[in-house]
Design a protein with these regions (language model features):
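Phosphate/ribose-recognition catalytic cores of enzymes acting on nucleotide-derived substrates
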Residues: 26-101
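Glycine-rich, Lys/Arg-enriched anion-binding loops that position phosphate/diphosphate groups
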Residues: 1-40, 45
C-alpha cells in the first residue's frame, strides 16, 4: 500500500503538480482494501510534527505517509504498521525494493 503512496508522490513530482494529501490517503486505503486488510489508519502528515496535512503540498516537499492495519481471519489479532517519507528518494527506493522481493 505504501508503494501506492510513493507512486502518487512521484507522479506529482514528475509533472510539477502539488501533492494532494487526500489523493495519497485514497491510494493508501484502496491498496490496503484490495489486499483484504482492515485499515486502522492511513495518514499523510508533516514529518516533523506528525500533524495530518489537509491542503496541497509542493511536489518536492517531504511528507510522511503512515499506515496501520489489522489482518483479518487470524486467531490472534495481528496489527501491522509502516511508514515512508515521501520526497526522500532513498526511503522511497528502500520501500519499493522491499515490495519487489
Amino acid at each position: 500500500a505504501l508503494a501506492a503512496a510513493v507512486a502518487v508522490a512521484r507522479d506529482a513530482r514528475a509533472t510539477g503538480r502539488v501533492l494532494d494529501p487526500d489523493a495519497v490517503r485514497s491510494a493508501l486505503r484502496a491498496a490496503l482494501a484490495a489486499d483484504g486488510l482492515e485499515v486502522v489508519y492511513a495518514e499523510v502528515a508533516d514529518p516533523t510534527t506528525v500533524v495530518p496535512l489537509d491542503g496541497p503540498v509542493p511536489p518536492d516537499a517531504e511528507v510522511l505517509a503512515a499506515v496501520a492495519v489489522t489482518v483479518p481471519g487470524r486467531e490472534l489479532r495481528v496489527r501491522l504498521i509502516d511508514n515512508v517519507l515521501l520526497g526522500d528518494v532513498a526511503d522511497e527506493e528502500r520501500l519499493l525494493a522491499a515490495v519487489a522481493e
